[in-house]
Amino acid sequence: MKFINTLFLALLISSISNNTNAEETYIGDVSMGEVKHSAAFTQMKRMLGEWEGKLYQQSGAVVDTYSKFRLVSNGNSIVETLIEDGVEMFTTYSDKDGKLVIKHYCALGTEPMFTVASMDKNSIQLKSDPRPGYHPEHHNFVKSMGWTFKDENDVRVDATLHLDGELQAQHSMIKRIN
């Protein structure tokens, strides 16, 4: 009898647990369904929240930087608001056909796209997607971006930019504030 009671209790707890995780999102009577995310999207979710720190430019200039990463669209997209030295920019992160797709709306007036170049448990590196058609001799644009996680609250952000035909590197050291 003790075995049957234990088994019943285990099944009851299991069914309650499964029902709690089985919530679906609806808009009106339309189910939004379930989407599986790439490992790269899951890695970027580590950035959710607010961050601030310093941006170190190749020229030697050091400016304030702030980022806010939010999960939107039923958890299927991440939007980043980035403010460098008071100038606001916007970046989106979402999956398409199982791969992370990134689009950056840059203060340079360009909208470069990125794909994953490499990833491990402590970093994700992005490279320029050639589809927007930017050329280093004719356009100013971000060529690469990457995040290296010291821990969940301290991150180094690296980027390279084509500026007036020259490739420049910069990095930020940011801390989670929320």
Which role does the model predict for each range below?
Residues 35-50:
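N-terminal helix-cap/turn-to-beta initiation motif at the start of protein domains
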Residues 140-144:
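Asp-box/WD-like beta-propeller blade repeats and closely related beta-sheet repeat scaffolds
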